[in-house]
Design a protein with these regions (language model features):
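A short, Lys/Arg-rich alpha-helix, primarily the initiator
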Residues: 1-23
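Residues at secondary-structure transition points
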Residues: 4, 8-12, 51, 55, ...
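Short basic helix-loop element that most often maps to the first helix and adjoining turn
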Residues: 15-34, 59
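Helix-turn-helix/winged-helix DNA-binding modules
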Residues: 23, 49-52, 63
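Recognition helix of helix-turn-helix/homeodomain-like DNA-binding domains
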Residues: 35-52
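DNA major-groove recognition helix of helix-turn-helix/homeodomain DNA-binding modules
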Residues: 36, 55-71
Length: 81
């Protein structure tokens, strides 16, 4: 069984979050401040060392300025394996 952290969908989510952060012109430390989290939290998510749940995805969306549904739609088009 494929570990969740290594799944194509998780990779797609990480890529999406990094793209959105960069598009917003935010550094990891800037996003961390908006999320009221540490920079290491952002790093762990972006490097696949930590999963984000739906609530966290919504927090990232609010902090960066994107629609969380857009991320979910993108993930739904990504193969499971």
């Amino acid at each position: 069984m494929v570990r969740t952290l290594d799944s194509p969908r998780h990779e797609a989510l990480r890529t999406f979050l990094i793209e959105r952060r960069n598009k917003a012109g935010l550094r990891q430390v800037d996003l961390a401040k908006r999320l009221r989290r540490s920079q290491s939290y952002v790093t762990y998510v972006e490097t696949g060392q930590k999963l984000v749940d739906v609530v966290e995805l919504m927090e990232w969306a609010d902090a960066i300025g994107f629609d969380a549904n857009e991320a979910i739609k993108r993930l739904s088009r990504t193969p499971k394996r």
